[in-house]
């Protein structure tokens, strides 16, 4: 690793419509090949569809869905002696958010349907209701951590 100074993280500008930094980060993660305007349109269209389907504030549904999918613990491989153990570890807030976003976007892309905005809206509504593929992924990660609780003392 270099010995240069550590650069400060660039601040993320909030999005224009909802004035939310989290929405901007989500758009950035969802973007393919630098097509930000297309991704932003998909995001806002899916928010309109959420408002239409649930009748609730889309930003509130989005943030609750994100909170429902955020994992608290995950397993990491640790080599001790000749054996490799899956050790449960707490996750820092930034990684929790990143994983939740990644899982929601991945689940929306795998869904069957025509428009990405429709698939994303459906996945966000499912995550809001504690169902759906992204929520199942979180449950699976938590189950793995619970199953390997015996190795928690290898944490360092």
Curated annotation (Swiss-Prot):
**PROSITE patterns, from UniProt?**
RIBOSOMAL_S7
Example of a GO cellular component annotation carried by this entry:
small ribosomal subunit
Is this entry keyworded rRNA-binding? yes
InterPro entries (UniProt xref): Ribosomal_uS7, Ribosomal_uS7_bac/org-type, Ribosomal_uS7_CS, Ribosomal_uS7_dom, Ribosomal_uS7_dom_sf
Q: Which domain of life is it from?
A: Bacteria
- What GO biological process terms are annotated to this protein in UniProt? translation
MF terms from GO for this chain are:
rRNA binding; structural constituent of ribosome; tRNA binding
Q: Which UniProt keywords apply?
A: Ribonucleoprotein, Ribosomal protein, RNA-binding, rRNA-binding, tRNA-binding
The protein's role, per its UniProt record: One of the primary rRNA binding proteins, it binds directly to 16S rRNA where it nucleates assembly of the head domain of the 30S subunit. Is located at the subunit interface close to the decoding center, probably blocks exit of the E-site tRNA.
The protein's assembly and partners? Part of the 30S ribosomal subunit. Contacts proteins S9 and S11.
What PANTHER family has UniProt attached to this entry? Answer: RIBOSOMAL PROTEIN S7
- Belongs to which family? Belongs to the universal ribosomal protein uS7 family.
Q: What is this protein called?
A: Small ribosomal subunit protein uS7
Organism of origin is: Treponema denticola (strain ATCC 35405 / DSM 14222 / CIP 103919 / JCM 8153 / KCTC 15104)
Q: What is the lineage of its organism?
A: Bacteria, Pseudomonadati, Spirochaetota, Spirochaetia, Spirochaetales
